């Protein structure tokens, strides 16, 4: 959603209702009208913005992230959070990762290029792709999503059926390296032919 759409929604929500905005894929987004987290945070006292180190920084196994909000909301959250809610290794890795601008830049460039490549290849194969701003593509075609998931797993390719998101015909694939994406496409062609 655009910044304007999000603000429109926020203006309809009572200030007593906590709104959580998950920006897990924020760094991947290249849409100019995407939400401006700093502007939103300073404007809405009931907004909690969450970020993770699992995506662009690649620290998924460390299970670490953070929240941004106005001071009063942070004070309330600090009263109810568990002590020692992240380990020191995860904290140290996160501190280093957030400063590694070169890694983030390279990851964004690789993802953008490979996402466009995958989107084009899937479209050329007759798939219907949902435009993506993240590190994944959701698509459907002339196949049963559950069967495709099972058959690709047998080939060593992990995709995700997204019926739980009320999209039973769609499969979601994570954007990988050039070699990973080419392997996925090769196996996809084998499975659907």
Give residue ranges: language-model regions.
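PLP-dependent aminotransferase class I/II
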Residues: 46-123, 127-130
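Hydrophobic residues in well-ordered beta-strands that form the structural core
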Residues: 21, 49, 86, 159-161
